[in-house]
Amino acid sequence: MGVLSALARGFVRGADRMAEWTSKRGPRTFYKSRGARPTGIVTSSRKFIPIRAMIPEFAVPNLEGFNLKAYVSYKTPAGTEEPMTPEKLFNEVVAPQIQRDIEEGVFSEDNLEKYGLEKTQEGKLFKLHPKNFAR
């Protein structure tokens, strides 16, 4: 920056607002490139050398045949599906597995961890189902 441009900047009303934005003016975490990471290095001769390992690679899935749209309008009506309850979740996920094991004859009350259940809730901060356990 030249001397004349610095002097001209000083005469302008609001000279502090006209100052060049540098890392000295921003917070401690301010980086001049606004969050973009460098993709290479600058040599002593001020030449930029890109480094392939520093360039991010994006893995984009194949969306061929994908039916959902990328945008959902705010004008869409509210959903009609009821909110998920623990009983509904149990009936949809765990109950069919237990019923299948009973039909096959391999169900055991000692092996409830197989279905994602816990034998006791000792040591838990919150008792999830207090009706099922003696107080």
UniProtKB/Swiss-Prot annotation:
Cell compartment(s), UniProt: Mitochondrion
GO molecular function: structural constituent of ribosome
Domain of life: Eukaryota
Subunit structure: Component of the mitochondrial ribosome large subunit (39S) which comprises a 16S rRNA and about 50 distinct proteins.
Sorted UniProt keywords: Apoptosis, Cell cycle, Mitochondrion, Ribonucleoprotein, Ribosomal protein, Transit peptide
Transit peptide as recorded in UniProt: 1-13
Function according to Swiss-Prot or TrEMBL: Component of the mitochondrial ribosome large subunit. Also involved in apoptosis and cell cycle.
GO terms (BP aspect): apoptotic process; translation
This protein's GO CC annotations: mitochondrial large ribosomal subunit; ribonucleoprotein complex
The protein's name in its UniProt record: Large ribosomal subunit protein mL41
Pfam families recorded: MRP-L27
Family, as annotated: Belongs to the mitochondrion-specific ribosomal protein mL41 family.
Main location as per UniProt: mitochondrion
